[in-house]
């Protein structure tokens, strides 16, 4: 069995949206890197990251932070605003192992 924890990023913080509504977001954690470390310490080997700013804008916005997460011991799969091969390549260039392209 494989359990993959997920982090939704907005303005550099981990948030939870209520039913996908950006107007109803709640900060879950200030430091995404610390939370990723907690997941790794709990035994996770993968991390799913969603760039909510990117999803809203139509192009990834949290590339630098996602790259920092990819430099941890976790394998990172990321998405949010990925619309073309340039976006995919930018994520691979910062160390992401898998890229999720959504509608």
Regions found by a protein language model. Give the residues of each.
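Conserved N-terminal beta1-alpha1 strand-loop-helix module at the mouth
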Residues: 1-74, 82-86
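Glycine-rich phosphate-binding active-site loops on the catalytic face of alpha/beta enzymes
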Residues: 82, 89-103
């Amino acid at each position: 069995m494989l359990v993959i924890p997920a982090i939704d990023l907005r303005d550099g913080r981990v948030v939870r949206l209520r039913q996908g509504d950006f107007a109803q977001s709640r900060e879950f954690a200030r430091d995404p890197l610390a939370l990723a470390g907690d997941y790794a310490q709990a035994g996770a080997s993968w991390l799913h990251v969603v760039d909510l700013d990117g999803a809203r804008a139509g192009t990834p916005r949290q590339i630098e932070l996602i790259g920092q997460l990819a430099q941890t011991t976790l394998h990172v799969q990321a998405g949010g605003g990925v619309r073309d091969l340039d976006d995919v390549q930018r994520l691979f260039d910062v160390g992401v192992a898998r890229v999720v392209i959504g509608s």
